[in-house]
C-alpha cells in the first residue's frame, strides 16, 4: 500500500492528528465536565474583553465576576487600541503575547468572528476555550478539539460559576 497520501496529509494538516472519535470527547457540554475544567483552572484570558467604560456589557462584567471568583483574568481586547489596562491588569493584543500558560480562553466574539482567532489560540495552546452564551462556531470548535483543546460553546461563564457555587 502506498502511504504517500497519508504522509502528505500529515505534513499539510499537522493539527488534525486526533481521530474523529477522540476529538469529540473534547467538546464539553455536561455540568460535571465544566465543573472539573473550572476547578483545575486559574488563569483565564478574555478575548474580546471590553474596558470599564463598557461596564454594563457582558464582555466587561463577566470577566469582572470571574476575577472576583478568584481567577486571574488576562485582558485581550480586540478593539480599544488606547486602553492599556482593564480590571487593573495589563492588556495584551494577541494571546500568543501573554506570558506563561493559559488555562482557559474565554471568547467574547460574534460566532463568525471566531475563526480568525483560531491560529492565535492554537499558537498559545490553552487547556480550553470557552465561548460565551450565544457564541457557537462548530468549525472552529472542531479545529480546536482536534488540536487537543477542550471546548465549551454557548455557555455563560458567570452563570455556570454561580450555578456551580465556584
Question: What do these predicted regions represent?
Answer:
Residues 2-4:
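Cysteine-centered motifs
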Amino acid at each position: 500500500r502506498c502511504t504517500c497520501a497519508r504522509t502528505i496529509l500529515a505534513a499539510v494538516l499537522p493539527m488534525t492528528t486526533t481521530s474523529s472519535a477522540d476529538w469529540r470527547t473534547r467538546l464539553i457540554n455536561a455540568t460535571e465536565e465544566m465543573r472539573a475544567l473550572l476547578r483545575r483552572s486559574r488563569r483565564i484570558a478574555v478575548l474580546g474583553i471590553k474596558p470599564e467604560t463598557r461596564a454594563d456589557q457582558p464582555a466587561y462584567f463577566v470577566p469582572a465576576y470571574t476575577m472576583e471568583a478568584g481567577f486571574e483574568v488576562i485582558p485581550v481586547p480586540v478593539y480599544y487600541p488606547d486602553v492599556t489596562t482593564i480590571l487593573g491588569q495589563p492588556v495584551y493584543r494577541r494571546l500568543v503575547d501573554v506570558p506563561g500558560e493559559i488555562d482557559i480562553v474565554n471568547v467574547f466574539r460574534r460566532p463568525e468572528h471566531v475563526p480568525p482567532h483560531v491560529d492565535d489560540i492554537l499558537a498559545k495552546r490553552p487547556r480550553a476555550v470557552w465561548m460565551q452564551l450565544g457564541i457557537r462556531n462548530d468549525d472552529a470548535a472542531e479545529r480546536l478539539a482536534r488540536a487537543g483543546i477542550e471546548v465549551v460553546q454557548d455557555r455563560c461563564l458567570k452563570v455556570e460559576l454561580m450555578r456551580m457555587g465556584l
